[in-house]
Amino acid sequence: LPGLTGVWVGEDKICSMGIAVRRWVSWHGFALNIHPNFEHWALIHPCGLVGRHVTSVEKLSGHPVDMGDVKRSIAEKAGDVFCMEPASIDRAELFKIAEEAL
């Protein structure tokens, strides 16, 4: 939707995106709704947008979606965009890298 950040399917938001810069380090990310609990979403306004609703990959596809498949697909597509080969690291190593960046 014009003027609104994120990814929208019709009038419903399926993905939020954000960026921040602290101490010369950029932080960026997105939140893709795969199979959220919509009862929880009824209690908040997504990104402060009153009267807007969220949707999900599962709701739009009409069947359960495997989170592992989603993660692999996103990693593959991100690798294509950035001309990189996706690699896995454990959580401890990730936190170490993040701390060193601060």
Regions picked out by a protein language model, each given a short descriptive name:
Residues 1-102:
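Catalytic beta-strand/loop module used to bind and position nucleotide/cofactor moieties
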